Amino acid sequence: EGKGSQFDPDIAEVMLSMIDEDEDYNMRQVEKMVSNILVVDDEKINIRLIENICKNEPLYKVIAAESGKQAIDIVGNQQIDLVLLDIEMPDMDGFQTLEEIRKITDVPVIFVTAYKDYKLIKRARQMGVEDYITKPFLPIVFLETLYGVIG
């Protein structure tokens, strides 16, 4: 009387190890769900803006490239789930960069650009671009576009 229930120490040890394993498993599942988003823009301020918008989204990890060539190198060496690609860049434009990326992978691509030209949008769609975001953009519109492509 007055004594609480006790677990058998062996059973308690097994249960604790199962909980630890389950936590490790859950952490691995969360890591698998994180989407690596490659932002390709020669303007650092645009990269910082996107990083700031995405920092409150725990399942989005932003990776930055300041040129098409750098983007191609990253795509060839890392798991990338989405590319946000500027059109107007000095070394290679967005279309040239996209052509090179397509030689490596069919990762979804969204153009993020100041251009609002219908012909450019049509060309982008023909090349397999998933969507098109014009700068400047509202953060909510930006995030909704990302959700629509990668969830």
Residue spans of the language-model regions?
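Receiver (REC) domain active-site loop signature in two-component systems and cognate sites
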Residues: M89
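Histidine- and acidic-residue-rich, metal-dependent catalytic cores
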Residues: E1-K32
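Two-component/phosphorelay signaling modules centered on CheY-like receiver
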Residues: K44-I63
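Helix N-cap/capping motif at the beta->alpha junctions
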Residues: A64-D73, G94
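Alpha4 helix (beta4-alpha4-beta5 surface) of REC/receiver domains from two-component response regulators
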Residues: Q96, K116-D131, E144
